């Protein structure tokens, strides 16, 4: 390694941004093929390349940060700023879905019967599965905070227990959401109600899956003693992301499930 006189990480050339972009193209194209032609081949190819990219990119970052010591305090500060900006961009992303929902529901057009929910739509009961989902995500927010405090105090076993509980609650939420979709009396093609409901809750569900994956990686890293009380930004970023997912769900629940029904 050549000598450097600064605290910043000069990243080596990497193929993973390219393969990540390719997998994103394959997944989005595959989703369209699945919706319109009921073919999942392209979607499966996209998911496979995405999983391989994630595994190898995470492996490289872990090697650079944990084993090569490239993540100095200055680098960590840059990563923190990057994660904050990423979460802000996600807030704006979901703002678009809420905008579409309120644009359609606050002044329903004559085509919708002049009412919301539109004529013929039977909305889900907000006091059944959606309320259980809310409880599950709020509980996971408590357990991820417990994990963070345990890590800061150097209590490895409690951190692992709390992180495992958070992951289990995330998986449980995903299964509940899948069962709700399966039982729903309307589909994504049922006008603007179906579109806004499934796109908003579906993208949130996707973010829960991404967050759960992030936490699973952190769980295995903690098993291998990668985190210390002073050097654990990977876990901190996952916790921030999980709290963001929690807050978005609260807005979804109040807006779409409770008020929108």
UniProtKB/Swiss-Prot annotation:
A Gene Ontology biological process term: mitochondrial electron transport, cytochrome c to oxygen
Xref: InterPro entries: Cyt_c/ubiquinol_Oxase_su3, Cyt_c_oxase_su3_dom, Cyt_c_oxidase-like_su3, Cyt_c_oxidase_su3-like_sf, Cyt_c_oxidase_su3_a-hlx
Parts of the chain on the Mitochondrial intermembrane side: 35-40, 106-128, 184-190, 257-261
Catalytic reaction equation(s): 4 Fe(II)-[cytochrome c] + O2 + 8 H(+)(in) = 4 Fe(III)-[cytochrome c] + 2 H2O + 4 H(+)(out)
CDD domains: Cyt_c_Oxidase_III
Subcellular location: Mitochondrion inner membrane
GO molecular function: cytochrome-c oxidase activity
Protein name: Cytochrome c oxidase subunit 3
Organism the protein comes from: Nanger granti
Taxonomic lineage: Eukaryota, Metazoa, Chordata, Craniata, Vertebrata
Gene behind the chain: MT-CO3
């Amino acid at each position: 390694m050549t000598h450097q006189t600064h605290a910043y990480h000069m990243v080596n050339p990497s193929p993973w941004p390219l393969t990540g972009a390719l997998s994103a193209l394959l997944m989005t194209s595959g989703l369209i093929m699945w919706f319109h032609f009921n073919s999942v081949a392209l979607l499966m190819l996209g998911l496979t390349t995405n999983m391989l990219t994630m595994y190898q990119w995470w492996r490289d970052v872990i090697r650079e940060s944990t084993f090569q010591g490239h993540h100095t305090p200055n680098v960590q500060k840059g990563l923190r700023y990057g994660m904050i900006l990423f979460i802000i961009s996600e807030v704006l992303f979901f703002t678009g879905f809420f905008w579409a929902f309120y644009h359609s529901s606050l002044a329903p057009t004559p085509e919708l019967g002049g009412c919301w929910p539109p004529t013929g739509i039977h909305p889900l009961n907000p006091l059944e599965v959606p309320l259980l989902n809310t409880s599950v995500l709020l509980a996971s927010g408590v357990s991820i905070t417990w994990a963070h405090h345990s890590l800061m105090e150097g209590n490895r076993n409690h951190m692992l227990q709390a992180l495992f509980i958070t992951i289990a609650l995330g998986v449980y939420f995903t299964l509940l959401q899948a069962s709700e979709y399966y039982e729903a009396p309307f589909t994504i093609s049922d006008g603007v109600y179906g579109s806004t409901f499934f796109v908003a809750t579906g993208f949130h569900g996707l973010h829960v899956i991404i967050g759960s994956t992030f936490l699973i990686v952190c769980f295995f890293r903690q098993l291998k003693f990668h985190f210390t009380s002073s050097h654990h930004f990977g876990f901190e970023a996952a916790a921030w992301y999980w709290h963001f997912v929690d807050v978005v769900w609260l807005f979804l629940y109040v807006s779409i499930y409770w008020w929108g029904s």
